[in-house]
């Protein structure tokens, strides 16, 4: 299983990388824009934060296949081994096919249906990123879509994997893992929600109080 953080906040990546067993960091144009840093400045800093073994994801901006391929090559030259995120449009599918031949690893992003995700996988994307909460927000069933996509990939594109994205709650992320997803990416607020459990703090405080009442201190 691969766990990623969905952010370009270098300080938060450094903080959470000490706690979470993260495999790397995913970004998108909106996330990079929010950082107020040039993508060419922030990507090396993120790579340094996750270490040489961590995997970094960044997205192209062009709308046509030729431009996507050119941008993907620039990203790969800047950060060797980076996974290039390509929106799963008609032009995006063409770009994914071309990049597969070039040996550049891709992720099919902005996936709103299982069929769309399957096409990305068949085109050669190693990862496929369904937008769970955004599907829910449009009146769909994000978890069911992920379940369908996971089954399709297992049957027809076993070399590709679902990297589920767009979460508002830890429950959504867990449901994707229960559906068999091998990878998820968490926004910072959802990652923090997983850590903040009031009942745990209450239990620890009770342990400490009982120990102190018995022994007068909190030492072993």
Swiss-Prot record:
The keyword Lyase applies. One of its GO terms (molecular function) is fructose 6-phosphate aldolase activity. GO terms for cellular component: cytoplasm. It comes from the Bacteria. SUPFAM superfamilies: Aldolase (SSF51569). It catalyses: beta-D-fructose 6-phosphate = dihydroxyacetone + D-glyceraldehyde 3-phosphate. Its EC number is 4.1.2.-. Signal peptide: none annotated. Keywords: Carbohydrate metabolism, Cytoplasm, Lyase, Schiff base. NCBIfam families: fsa_talC_mipB (TIGR00875), PRK12653.1 (NF009296). Homodecamer. Belongs to the transaldolase family. Type 3A subfamily. This is Fructose-6-phosphate aldolase. It comes from Salmonella typhimurium (strain LT2 / SGSC1412 / ATCC 700720). The lineage of its organism: Bacteria, Pseudomonadati, Pseudomonadota, Gammaproteobacteria, Enterobacterales. The gene is fsa.
